[in-house]
UniProtKB/Swiss-Prot annotation:
Full protein name: Accessory Sec system protein translocase subunit SecY2
Biological processes per GO annotation: intracellular protein transmembrane transport; protein targeting
Entry GO CC: plasma membrane
Transmembrane stretches, start-end: 14-34, 65-85, 104-124, 131-151, 156-176, 191-211, 247-267, 285-305, 343-363, 368-388
Domain of life assignment: Bacteria
Keyword set, alphabetical order: Cell membrane, Membrane, Protein transport, Translocation, Transmembrane, Transmembrane helix, Transport
Disruption phenotype: Deletion of 15 genes (from psrP, SP_1772 to SP_1756, includes the accessory Sec export proteins SecA2 and SecY2) and infection of female BALB/cJ mice, shows the psrP-secY2A2 region is required for lung infection and for infection to progress to blood. Mice infected intraperitoneally showed wild-type infection. Decreased adherence to lung but not pharynx or brain cells. The psrP-secY2A2 region deletion has no effect on bacterial growth rate, capsule levels, autolysis, or transformation.
HAMAP family xref list: SecY2 (MF_01466)
Organism: Streptococcus pneumoniae serotype 4 (strain ATCC BAA-334 / TIGR4)
Family: Belongs to the SecY/SEC61-alpha family. SecY2 subfamily.
SUBUNIT field: Component of the accessory SecA2/SecY2 protein translocase complex required to export cell wall proteins. May form heterotrimers with SecE and SecG subunits.
SUPFAM superfamilies according to UniProt: Preprotein translocase SecY subunit
Keyword set includes Membrane: yes
Chain's role: Part of the accessory SecA2/SecY2 system specifically required for export of possible cell wall proteins. The central subunit of a protein translocation channel.
């Protein structure tokens, strides 16, 4: 028993469980002075925003202090990564502390937009001042977002899985209810349900295959002359971005939806804004095509976030490693980036076919939105499970060795 509790993996797992208890407890703290009987308070975007909030640690059904979730922080990370590719902006040339502070400022800006959009549309009880309730709930939602960011940082340093665990628990708690409500709303024949179940098994197999498949690049290390040198490889995933594109595209596309809600409240009689908001509503052709395009774009962007050729080449150069037939430095960087680009396109096409293709059915019936999101949900869920599994495996690696004395 003592050996079990002395394990690093067990200690980190217990700490993560404690943080999850805090998260579940906080998600049950309801915003004050709100009429909970009104469900469709965000108009035509309620179903999508509730689903996307559940994927990012939020919950728009219970209207708790964690309703917005980690969506502002995730959207800020996306924008920061996109801006970081520009050398002119010089975002990565500053210290880590300054970069983190700027990321938090960007998170605060997006959190204000999303929290204010939700608060302005909340069904406030008539016996209280609407202005004070909106102001208080906006502050509470912003505070809830930053509290979740803090929990994620704590879990990343002292627990297992980082922010992934919070997102995973939110999905487990909320997504099954979404799927059941869809089956109750939309009549689907039994034969179609059986076919969907079989396709789910096939998709799960393909997903595991894509996540575990690796392209091995032989690497030589200076001074290494033994029989193990042939086992030195640089591994590149067949789908380098994994399930991150789907997770972040849901968060990223929710920002315009919140922004349209906020602008619609500020300018209620603006015909052009109303027309644009209607065209970009969830399930409309413009939104579906933007969703598929952004999903493919994020598959490429996050592939380079996961495997940056410049960083890998610099690390190999410092450790005395090189790829056969490729000069160290800039040539190695270009070689790796070409491979990452090639596999990111393959991964992007896989993501678009599996997670973007079902979205085309939404053009015929918007009620199928939640069902169309299930394949992408599997991709996201699978990526999280594999990430946590690899982290636990790495933590337990040192415990497999026995002391010499």
């Amino acid at each position: 028993m003592t050996k079990i509790y002395s394990s690093i993996a067990v200690k980190k797992g217990l700490f993560t469980s404690f943080l999850l208890f805090i998260y579940v407890l906080g998600s049950r703290i309801i915003l004050p002075f709100v009429d909970l009987n009104t469900k469709d308070f965000l108009g035509g975007s309620t179903a999508y925003l509730a689903f996307s909030a559940a994927l990012t640690g939020g919950n728009l059904r219970s209207l708790s202090i964690f309703s917005v979730g980690l969506s502002p922080w995730m959207s800020a990370m996306i924008l920061w990564q996109m801006f970081s590719f520009s050398k002119r902006l010089g975002l990565t040339s500053t210290s880590i502390e300054i970069q983190d502070r700027r990321k938090m400022y960007l998170t605060l800006l997006i959190a204000v937009i999303q929290s204010l959009a939700v608060s302005l549309r909340l069904p406030v009880q008539s016996s209280y001042s609407a202005i004070l309730v909106v102001l208080m709930n906006t502050i509470l939602l912003i505070a809830g977002t930053f509290f979740l960011v803090w929990l994620s940082d704590l879990n990343a340093s002292m627990g297992i899985g980082g922010s992934i665990v919070i997102l995973l628990s939110s999905m487990v708690l909320n997504i099954p209810q979404d799927v059941l409500e869809t089956f109750q709303t939309v009549h689907i024949p039994t034969g179609i349900i059986v076919l969907l179940a079989l396709l789910t098994l096939v998709f799960s197999y393909l997903l595991a295959l894509m996540y575990r498949a690796r392209y091995l690049v032989p690497v030589n290390k200076i001074g290494l002359h033994n029989r193990f040198k042939r086992y030195s490889y640089l591994e590149i995933m067949l789908n380098p971005a994994g399930g991150m594109p789907y997770m972040y595209v849901m968060s990223f596309l929710s920002v315009p939806a919140y922004l349209f809600i906020l602008l619609g409240f500020i300018f209620p009689n603006h015909s052009g804004l109303a027309a644009l908001s209607k065209e970009f509503m969830v399930g409309k052709p413009l939104w579906v095509y933007v969703y598929i395009s952004v999903l493919f774009l994020f598959s490429i962007i996050f592939a380079f976030v996961t495997m940056n050729g410049e960083e890998i080449a610099d690390r190999m150069k410092k450790s005395g490693e090189y790829i056969y037939g490729i000069y160290p430095g800039a040539d190695t960087s270009r070689f790796i980036n070409r491979l990452v680009l090639r596999f990111s396109v393959i991964g992007g096409l896989f993501n678009v076919i599996m997670a973007g293709g079902p979205m085309l059915f939404v053009l015929f019936d918007e009620k199928l939105l939640r069902l169309a999101m299930i394949p992408g949900l599997f991709m996201m869920f699978g990526g999280m499970i594999f990430t946590i599994r690899d982290e636990v495996k790495a933590l337990r690696l040192n415990e497999t060795y026995r002391p010499l004395i």
